[in-house]
Amino acid sequence: TGYLCGEAFHGKSVYIISRRPLRDQFAGVIIALSPQKGGAEPKIIVAPEGDIFYEPQIRERLRSVRGLDISQLSCLYEKSCGAVIFYRSPDGNKVLLVKNHNGKYWSFPKGHVEKGESEKQTALREIKEETGLDVKIYDHYRQISDYCPFGKIKKRVIFFLAETKTDQVDIQQDEIDSFVWATFPQAEKMCSYENDLRVLHAARRYIDKKDAHNGSPDSI
């Protein structure tokens, strides 16, 4: 534990999470707030500047702290993993786009990392849960998408490239509103976010290069 310095929080006690020993004073950032029972002030969790901890890591490190309620932990950094999923249909390659209940735009299947999972394990689990698809994840394709909706929670999404052998999708109805298989040119028109377009373009280039190397006749 320690204390914050600064006009807004001067002298307020905090919980500190770090991967290395710290000096008596250091520059840190608030990474989470933990509301307490009985209307008490939320506890502040801080990490050294430049270090990022996500919810599973924060919970693991704080679970043994006596007297700290982390049942309603609110993390200011979130990490998700997913994939650009494509299918080699008879009339060309198609990419799967989904629209979530709380989203207005087309994007790719993804979800939060759970404790003990690798990035690829998270992506495979989320794909299976949201779409029912079994996929093969390609090596050497890993795209990072960072964004901060409403200027609050900083979100990072790791996207892989995955191929499925079927276009039969079984959507998770409590998560997904709708889905569509689109050609890459169609998907580029449907995706609204710059990050999603960048991820999509990188996937298309990767498949083009791999197919050219393998002599595949597929065209996207």
Regions found by a protein language model. Give the residues of each.
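Short small-residue beta-strand/loop micro-motif enriched in glycine and branched aliphatics
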Residues: 39-41, 105-109
